């Protein structure tokens, strides 16, 4: 793989993947609106607000794969969640599609599936029952 994009690269999981995926692609393109360590060998650091459609279109250019971890990961005002998590995800998918690179790994949340009895077995067909406004944006 030539170039792999990781959004939310300044977050906990993003930092783990940044280290763990070194060498998997020729270049790891790392993006977040939060500060990150400078680019190392085989890395590009590209700050980007995912709610900015044209910036996201540029961000996804020349990427062979995308790992989407970006957005707000806690409960917040619904308008903020919509911009970061819903519109940001939409822009990322559209940027990838328009650039001919439709492969995206999307990290959702247990808050999208909501509360179930501990004994309930859940699978990909289980009903979504978001437990918060944050959960709604991760469905």
Which stretches of residues belong to each language-model region?
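Rossmann-fold cofactor-recognition segment
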Residues: 40-52
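NAD(P)-cofactor binding segment of oxidoreductase domains
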Residues: 66, 76-105
